[in-house]
Every structure is written in structure tokens, then in C-alpha cells.
């Protein structure tokens, strides 16, 4: 499980295997692609499911000003690791 607090997002990254994600509480904000644009993220409310396809670039987190953190249960085949699209930048961003 992961908890994203308001105003924090991951940098664009991908995984070697599919990730299956269920939002347990709060609203999670997600986007696909290698270009970081937090204003273009899509809200995913509690109870929703997201499938991240292996090797597809994406980023996610909770937008600044959100009422609460988002808690997400993530599963998939392992072991795996995140591959940052731009390893010269931090793996998470304060937005």
C-alpha cells in the first residue's frame, strides 16, 4: 500500500510488470506519459481500479489542496522496481 499526501506526486516512471491498483480512500490523481503535467492528471475516487501496463510511463499522487491523502493498494508480479524516465530528477515532486 501507498499513501500520497496532498501536494505530492511521483515523477514520470514505469515498471517492468503490470501493476493493479485499487484506491482504498481519498482521491488519487493519475496521468500517463513521460511529460510531467500535474494539472492534466485525472481524479480516481475511492473504490476505483487502475491497471498500469508494464513499461508504460505514468505519474500519480494527490494534487495540492485536496481534502485528504489517498491510500492505494498496489499489487502485481514481482520483484519489480520503478524506472524513472529522467533519473537526474527526484522520484517525487512537491506540487
Report each predicted region and the residues it spans.
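Extracellular/periplasmic catalytic domains that process cell-envelope and extracellular macromolecules
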Residues: 14-15, 22, 42-43, 63-68
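Solvent-exposed coil/turn segments that connect beta secondary-structure elements
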Residues: 7, 28, 55, 77-78
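Short acidic-glycine-tyrosine-enriched beta hairpin
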Residues: 28, 34-63
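Double-stranded beta-helix
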Residues: 39, 51, 59-95
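Residue-level recognition of well-ordered beta-strand positions that form the cores
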Residues: 1-3, 27, 75
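Glycine- and acidic-residue-biased ligand/ion/polar-headgroup-sensing regions
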Residues: 5-7, 15-36
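Hydrophobic/aromatic beta-strand elements that line small-molecule binding cavities or substrate pockets
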Residues: 2, 18-20, 48, 60
